[in-house]
Design a protein with these regions (language model features):
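Cap/insert and terminal regions of metallo-dependent hydrolase folds
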Residues: 110, 197, 203-294
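Divalent metal-coordination and catalytic microenvironments
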Residues: 51, 61, 73, 90, ...
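Metallo-beta-lactamase
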Residues: 117-196, 287-298
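Conserved beta-strand hairpin/beta-sheet module of binuclear metal-dependent hydrolase folds
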Residues: 27-76, 191-210
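Bacterial N-terminal signal peptides
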Residues: 6-15
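Boundary at the C-terminal end of the N-terminal hydrophobic targeting segment
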Residues: 19-23
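Active-site environment of divalent metal-dependent phosphoester hydrolases
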Residues: 37-38, 66-68, 93-97, 118-121, ...
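Active-site metal-binding motif and surrounding structural segment of the metallo-beta-lactamase
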Residues: 67-116, 225-235, 239
Length: 299
């Protein structure tokens, strides 16, 4: 009889385990943006979202202002102490403004950021440093770098002392079905800026979370398609705000005709005209994704 009870108990526990996994959230919660439905949440220029998928909790970017980010985190009852890791898409302040608050709450959290000279504590490479410090004949002593005796390597501190960044220089899988997609901008004003996007493999295709899309959203889609040619949704900043109406319409139409994307939840630097175009092309598959909105991810 005792053996029978034990078997029944173990069978019951085995049935509970899959149910628990199935109940874990599969969603993106927008923490920081400049628009949204009326609520107690603050608005600000920048972007931040909490991504939850298959038991992982990932903070993607941290918005543009410390106080606004902190207030919204508290109002949304998000526990930063239980994050699995943080992804910083790129170096701009409207995506890193709340990082100090994250580190106050979770000082040892793993942070992924793009490898880039001068950012996140990354010094110039030795060849670059040598080029910067080359000697010039005839220069007076008071104008010589380091009194004419430069160090072998230049050092640059991070604005977040003691933080251990994991710096990414190529696209990589960081957890089963979770990928960091690295691209480089060739646009005027952000030339050679490195950017990371987060691709999530779902049963319906990739869900792609983007910060600001400086390299170009279609270039990011191309890079992400190495992990799955089926693209389900894009969430985040598409950087169409400074494009002409014609360019915006072309990109939005390409989402449908070239990339066969099913849904879009655009935010931040996408721009108001682009939002109108997304509404026209995607209809009820255009997910309004202002601050506080929750976007479901297929599981």
């Amino acid at each position: 009889m005792k053996l029978l009870r034990l078997i029944v108990l173990l069978a019951g526990l085995s049935c509970l385990a899959p149910a628990k996994a199935a109940d874990s959230p599969a969603r993106v919660t927008v923490i920081f943006d400049a628009f949204g439905k009326p609520s107690a949440l603050e608005r600000g220029w920048g972007y931040s979202a909490l991504v939850e998928y298959k038991g992982k909790r990932i903070l993607f970017d941290t918005g543009g202002q410390y106080q606004t980010f902190a207030e919204n985190v508290r109002k949304l009852k998000i526990d930063l102490k239980t994050l699995d890791f943080v992804v910083i898409s790129h170096r701009h302040g409207d995506h890193t403004g709340g990082l100090a608050y994250v580190l106050e709450q979770n000082p040892h959290v793993k942070i992924y950021a793009p490898l880039e000279t001068g950012s996140f504590g990354t010094p110039p490479s030795p060849p670059a440093a040598k080029a910067l410090l080359r000697n010039a004949a005839g220069i007076t002593p008071d104008l010589r770098y380091f009194n004419g005796q430069p160090p072998d390597n230049l050092t640059i501190d991070s604005p977040w002392p003691g933080t251990k960044f994991t710096l990414i220089d190529k696209s990589i899988e960081i957890a089963p079905g979770l990928f960091l997609v690295k691209t480089v901008s060739d646009s005027k004003g952000t030339l050679e800026l490195n950017e990371l996007s987060l691709a999530i493999r779902t049963p319906k295709g990739l869900a792609l979370v983007v910060g600001c899309s400086h390299p170009g959203i279609e270039r990011i889609l191309e890079a992400a398609s190495q992990y799955d040619t089926q693209l389900y949704t894009i969430v985040g900043g598409l950087h169409l705000v400074d494009k002409s109406d014609q360019q915006v319409s072309e990109v939005v139409n390409n989402f449908k005709t070239r990339w066969h994307i099913e849904r879009v939840a655009a935010g931040h630097c996408t721009g108001e005209f682009a939002q109108v175009e997304l509404e026209r092309v995607f209809g009820d598959h255009h997910d309004h994704s202002g601050v506080g909105e929750v976007i479901a991810i297929p599981r």
